[in-house]
């Protein structure tokens, strides 16, 4: 049984105010009867006001004009945002606040593929989605669809990603401004530093707010981590496209950039200009190494099992880091 039920009315147009109410009443009644007892979150997604078509002109269909509908709507939360990205991200926050993971989405058939594309970007495998068709009659019926989307093209997917990225960039930093802790011990030919937990947009308590690691087992999606990384790159002055994290296995493997990348490694070393390497640290110690003579650097995270990793890195004059995160790179020429 779904813990949360979402009804997608985003962008729908209705052919009369009366039919608008009848359709919504039927759908909301069905949801309430089947899910109200067990679902902890019932939600309607819409874009501003729902518009009703009358004689070729658009009138605003105010939901509050129907007493029966108004009473029923009290059982639902309405999320009305100007974009689908904003709507779904707002809903995700509400779902995460309640620690829910089983979600039913009732969506018009022509919008199902579009909805799935947004969900794939904004949610992780922690969540379990099921989809149900919102019954929409297209011929002399109650609802009209403005555009049909049966398949997502590469261009449409790019537009979805751009919409999400634009929205995430507009979000304020949480828990304070972004901070990068540096040391005068490392010469300024290296961009280096340790980040803290402030300045990002991750709102999950255990990840808030500057999470730089995404996982299918976490609620923070890749797009949020990428936005945190973008903000870090802008603040520190490195190229986010040339950013490399360790892939820890709590062993002694070191990736020397330029050689074949191992499947997992607890340290990275490099002498390549313009490349940034980072180690993420939670309960392990992140370490940065910089050799101004060889112009090489490295990062690793070190716990009880990482002694061999540290020795290996010192031999190659590089760095270590882990999940706080630590970052370092050799500045590109110019």
Show which residues each predicted segment covers.
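Acidic, glycine-enriched active-site microenvironments
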Residues: 170-175, 180, 186-191, 200
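Extended, non-transmembrane interaction/recognition domains
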Residues: 107, 111-168
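Generic structural signal for well-ordered, non-membrane alpha-helical segments
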Residues: 20, 81-84, 88, 111-112, ...
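Intrinsically disordered, low-complexity, positively charged segments
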Residues: 190-231
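N-terminus-biased targeting/localization segments
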Residues: 1-96, 114
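Phosphate/pyrophosphate-binding loops at sites that engage ATP/ADP/AMP, CoA/4′-phosphopantetheine
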Residues: 34-39, 94-97, 233-236, 320-330
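Active-site beta-strand/loop microenvironment that shapes enzyme catalytic pockets
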Residues: 10-11, 16-28, 40, 46-56, ...
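Phosphate-centric recognition/catalysis
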Residues: 222-302
């Amino acid at each position: 049984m779904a813990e949360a039920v979402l009804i997608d009315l985003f962008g729908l147009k209705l052919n009369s105010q009366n039919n608008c109410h009848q359709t919504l009443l039927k759908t909301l009644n069905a949801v309430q009867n089947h899910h109200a007892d067990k679902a902890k979150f019932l939600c309607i997604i819409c874009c501003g006001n729902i518009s009703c078509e009358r004689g070729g002109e658009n009138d605003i269909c105010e939901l509050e004009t129907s007493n029966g509908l108004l009473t029923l709507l009290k059982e639902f939360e309405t999320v009305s945002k100007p974009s689908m990205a904003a709507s779904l991200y707002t809903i995700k926050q509400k779902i995460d606040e309640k620690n829910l993971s089983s979600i039913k989405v009732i969506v018009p058939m022509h919008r199902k593929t579009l909805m799935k594309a947004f969900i794939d970007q904004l949610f992780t495998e922690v969540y379990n989605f099921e989809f149900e068709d919102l019954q929409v009659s297209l011929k002399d019926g109650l609802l009209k669809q403005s555009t049909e989307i049966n398949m997502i093209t590469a261009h449409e997917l790019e537009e979805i990603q751009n919409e999400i990225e634009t929205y995430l960039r507009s979000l304020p930093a949480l828990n304070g401004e972004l901070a990068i802790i540096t040391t005068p011990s490392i010469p300024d030919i290296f961009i280096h530093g340790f980040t803290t937990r402030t300045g990002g947009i991750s709102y999950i308590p255990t990840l808030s707010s500057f999470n730089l690691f995404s996982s299918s087992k976490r609620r923070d999606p890749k797009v949020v981590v990428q936005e945190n990384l973008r903000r870090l790159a802008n603040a520190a002055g490195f190229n986010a496209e040339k950013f490399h994290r360790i892939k820890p296995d709590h062993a002694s493997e070191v990736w020397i950039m330029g050689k074949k990348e191992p499947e997992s490694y607890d340290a990275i070393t490099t002498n390549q200009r313009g490349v940034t390497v980072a180690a993420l640290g939670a309960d392990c110690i992140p370490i940065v190494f910089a050799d101004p003579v060889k112009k090489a650097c490295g990062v690793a995270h070190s716990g009880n099992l990482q002694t061999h990793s540290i020795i290996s890195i010192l031999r190659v004059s590089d760095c270590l880091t882990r999940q706080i995160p630590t970052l370092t790179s050799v500045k590109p020429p110019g």
